[in-house]
Amino acid sequence: MKLLLFILMISSIIIVPVGQAQRIKDLASVQGVRSNQLVGYGLVVGLPGTGEQSPFTEQSFRTMLSNFGISLDSSLKPKIKNVAAVAVHAELPPFLKPGQTIDVTVSSVGEAASLRGGTLLQTFLKGLDGKVYAVAQGSMVVSGFGAEGADGSKIVANTPTVGRIANGALIERAVPSGFMQNDFLTLNLNYPDFSTAKILADTINQRLGADPDKGYVIATPIDAASVRVSAPRDVGQRVGFLATLENFEFMPAKAPARIVINSRTGTIVIGQDVRLLPAAITHGGLTVTISENQQVTQPNPLGQGDTVVTDQSIIDVNLDDTRMFKFDPGVTLDQLVRAVNEVGAAPGDLMAILEALSEAGALQGELVVI
């Protein structure tokens, strides 16, 4: 019964009820308005002996000192257990301007035990084009904790080698945007669907007073993912136009019948439109249990024999009772789960049954294994 309730609960959460309108901004994004990934390499200093002595960390440390006019003899090997080499990455949201700040994540790339208590020195964050878009620096917040004893025993909570700096990067260069380059905007659906694209275009035309029959069209579906919308050229008018447009509500097309299985976690999500063709199923399990026991044999107290330890293997074979159940045409989600649950099938068994039904062509829906 727990399996039935769990699957029905998850399905009710993720499946949008039929007839529920949603805003355009929740289902689509404007083409060209996107975040950009930034990455950099730097040094964290001030660690309480939890740093590292990796060759690349030492080389980076020498380079940093050289930039400050300090030269170390090549024969000297500095002890830098309070320094760690790190990778720094951040997301640069659209339209942010120089002088604004963004959060950064700092991750150890060497053998550092922890970044707690460290400070990131000035690190250039570059984009895919190799240009510097932001500079990161500051003290980190590390949620993880680690401690190690002299005998090698240690305890680690969460991840002490990853930290975060809120507003830790200062933007130095804005990313060019194509928001004003054309006489139109392109809306990209988060989940491409031809029916939804047409409904979206029809909704925009209707709400903005377009008349496709007379050749006056504002929104045109391009493909399953994109809808092109005519927009004002003036900056102020375009912003106001998009602010109004993204709050229009419409009813997207029903999602295709789909079953998603995560074989690693045992999670199964079944869409409400999944149906079954007539099919009969039997599913049973053969369980083999092997256990090892050690038996000690003591010699006679007056004898000259030795104590002998022998291994004893116990093999137990259990064949579960199998039951066959039959599906009539058009069986729904509720009936499918209830029937499988009544025969005592675990989530792993349900996965095997669904895969077998798909192979047999009796499953009217797409089976996705992730």
UniProtKB/Swiss-Prot annotation:
<protein>
    <recommendedName>
        <fullName>Flagellar P-ring protein</fullName>
    </recommendedName>
</protein>
<dbReference type="Pfam" id="PF02119">
    <property type="entry name" value="FlgI"/>
</dbReference>
<keyword id="KW-0574">Periplasm</keyword>
<comment type="subunit">
    <text>The basal body constitutes a major portion of the flagellar organelle and consists of four rings (L,P,S, and M) mounted on a central rod.</text>
</comment>
<dbReference type="GO" id="GO:0009428">
    <property type="term" value="C:bacterial-type flagellum basal body, distal rod, P ring"/>
</dbReference>
<comment type="function">
    <text>Assembles around the rod to form the L-ring and probably protects the motor/basal body from shearing forces during rotation.</text>
</comment>
<keyword id="KW-0732">Signal</keyword>
<feature type="signal peptide">
    <location>
        <begin position="1"/>
        <end position="21"/>
    </location>
</feature>
<dbReference type="GO" id="GO:0030288">
    <property type="term" value="C:outer membrane-bounded periplasmic space"/>
</dbReference>
<comment type="similarity">
    <text>Belongs to the FlgI family.</text>
</comment>
<dbReference type="InterPro" id="IPR001782">
    <property type="entry name" value="Flag_FlgI"/>
</dbReference>
<dbReference type="GO" id="GO:0071973">
    <property type="term" value="P:bacterial-type flagellum-dependent cell motility"/>
</dbReference>
<keyword id="KW-0975">Bacterial flagellum</keyword>
<dbReference type="GO" id="GO:0005198">
    <property type="term" value="F:structural molecule activity"/>
</dbReference>
